[in-house]
Amino acid sequence: GFIHLTTAAFHYFKAHGGGHIAVISSIAGTKGLGSAPAYSATKRFQNTYIEALEQLARMQHYPIRFTDIRPGFVATDLLKGGRYPMLMQAPKVAARIVRAIDRRQTVAVIDGRYRVLVFFWRLIPRWLWKRMPVRNR
């Protein structure tokens, strides 16, 4: 799904003189999350795939822009009834996504609280991270 759609968009924009590919991944791609290993690995793959396509477009001089949108927890039916930290309302998230695309941001971590969280997550060494009881509920 993700690879086919993103690659199709890349080839379409390559053939038509440029464009902007925006994908929604997640902050879960920042670190391996023991509470959701497959999910965090998939999101990390998406981050890396977009980064690689962006580099390819630049090397080949294709005028294709990319925005990797990385929200945290968004209040949707999928999360209904659960207790999730820093839950964001969907309309607010949608407005921030539109703003990130309009500003041509390469990576957009949605919401300042999550930007701070991601910043600190990246500072945690692997030996310590694997000992932390990170939960998503």
Residue ranges: model-predicted function:
Residues 26:
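Residue(s) in the substrate-gating loop at a strand-loop-helix junction
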Residues 68, 80-118:
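C-terminal helical subdomain
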Residues 31-37, 82:
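Active-site loop immediately N-terminal to the catalytic Tyr-X3-Lys motif
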Residues 14-15, 57-62, 74:
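A short hydrophobic alpha-helix cap/turn motif
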Residues 6, 42:
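Active-site helix of classical SDR
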Residues 8-17:
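A short helix-coil junction within the Rossmann-fold of NAD(P)-dependent oxidoreductases
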Residues 31, 52-64:
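Active-site-adjacent segment of SDR/Rossmann-fold oxidoreductases
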Residues 65-71, 75:
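Conserved SDR Rossmann-fold cofactor-binding beta-strand/turn motif
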